[in-house]
């Protein structure tokens, strides 16, 4: 037997530090997601700005929507709108909000029905069912408008039903103003210059904009919508493959006046950028994350943004999209 070589301590250094606490509930683990630099992508793409990713898939159920899933139910309970064991929750969603509501509903004692477009990924539908949620699929051609219409029908007919209504609920942007924006501010030591986020409900971008501009009005916040359904640019809504953004209408939770612009990113650009991030940085991100990163790279390439800190919000992990075009040809 060959002589064992003593292990070096180096491989075990640099891991995340312990937080010194035991969480009383899975709900308490939402938020506090990391900001990560992209050294290899920066070098490969000759970026001038300092581009960071805020990895929201570090939330307990793997997406940015965990923040609003918990916030909307906690807010409704505090206002006496829902009661555990009696109220039936109904929500239209392309998947991630439903998954986040499902884990919060289980933890707090509610039944959940999710209506969603039929082109939502198989992984999302199975996750919902795993946590006991009922799902109803609506035509893909109707987009989120069709899912909303069906949810409203159920809300009118079922007794003791309540819709969190992520596209209208003020707790949606409010939780991002109170948490996501403050995390970005603190983790960059107040040196953030720009933030890019996909626009689904618009709550993430709007809340971050309100929160950060309280600290410094010069901070720029940009949204991203699919080029194939660029409603905010005056185009007609249309089918697209960037799940989670581009609902086909302007939601109440979107405050366009708080934003400094909206990028159009195509499905092809979003997928290619998500794959690039995985291949170059080893960070497998979802399709809408690829869209946000594409826009972030566009900003970081500009000579005028040399040395500026740009944050792109990564809503979810690639593994939630195994059955989508993100993984086409990779088997």
Predicted features along the sequence, with ranges:
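PLP-dependent amino-acid enzyme catalytic core
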Residues: 1-331
